[in-house]
Amino acid sequence: MSSATVAATDNRTRCDAIRHWLTPHRLHCIVLAAYVIVVGTVMCFHEPWFDEAQAWLIARDCSWREMILERPHYEGHPPLWWMMLAAPAKLGVPYEIGLKSINLTCATLMIWLLEFKTKLPEPFKVILPFSYFLCYQYGVTSRPMR
């Protein structure tokens, strides 16, 4: 068998595996894609508030030691959000791009877990991602949750 035939067979096998996985999960993939589109679009028009900027400034200006040991006492919530924002903030990524991209990644992961890893009834899995809290409060606003 030539290497071209083996490569074509490998590609066909991969495509069959993807098609086999996608068939029962088609609705969940559509819901996830729609969620990312809706939240991404609304994020473009959302103006961050002072508390969203506060987290970015803490991530940008504090040392790791201060971020983990000192700031939680004053801010009242755990430092995980600042730690996730620290890499783009300290690398000089623009404020809104860095903040919103990290938040969109977290929100997408949340909906992926909801769609593919929970045993909720199908109607809940379709409707729940577009509820006020999951779509706007947790998806669009970039605030640490207490």
Residue ranges, per PLM feature:
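Short, intrinsically disordered terminal tails adjacent to the first/last structured region
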Residues: 1-25
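Coil-to-alpha-helix initiation sites in intrinsically disordered, low-complexity, charged segments
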Residues: 10-17, 63, 78-82
